[in-house]
Amino acid sequence: EIVNVEVWAWTEKRLYTEQEVRLENEKKRSYAVVWHIQRNQIVPLATSEVPEVRFQEQRDAPLALGFTEEPYAQYLTSEGTAHKDLYALDVQTGARQRIVRDLRCNPSLSPATRYILWWSDPDTAWYAWSAATQKIRPLTNTRLSDFHETDNDVPDFPSAYGAAGWMENDAALIVYDQYDLWKTDPLGVQAPVRLTQGYTTKTRYRYLRLDPERRYLRPDETLLLHSFNTLTKAEGYARLDL
């Protein structure tokens, strides 16, 4: 009698059933490269150590984001949340630099690729890494306001309220707290500024993005906001001059 035995150890990072599902995909895995046409050179970006690469939407940026979940694979099984190390990848040379370890979120590149932005669940704060200074700076903190979902009722870290978007040339990032919009400086030179006054009346303001292809906000424009009073349930629209 032939017996099929599946041998698996508790020390393995992934469950055996997950390994079986991933096996075929891993056999067919491809790695992102860049072909520089003018110099006829192919530059590998993804590797077995950093297999995941994310490009800016227009795919014309000098930087790309690299990820690896392998050191934290067991967390996906136990927590249901993917942890990852974040890398900045030089599209010209393929050189990579590890920015931060053990992230639980999905970072993004700013429109002008001057910064890498992410939300830190444990700190409940926004962070940005500067390509120019090679430094990480917090954009918000809980002393100013709560930028995380205060009514989170699950046994996990709360999510961010989100962001309205970047200003032109990555000059600032506008983020949300429970009610208001805040203008933050990714260089840390200027303190965050509250742009609306929703807290006093418990009115929530959110930016209405009328053009989904807009990459940034201009400093001289007027934003259309949606307003919702959490006490009276009245809603409407407002204008905000940047």
Where are these regions (language model features)?
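Beta-propeller folds
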Residues: E1-L242
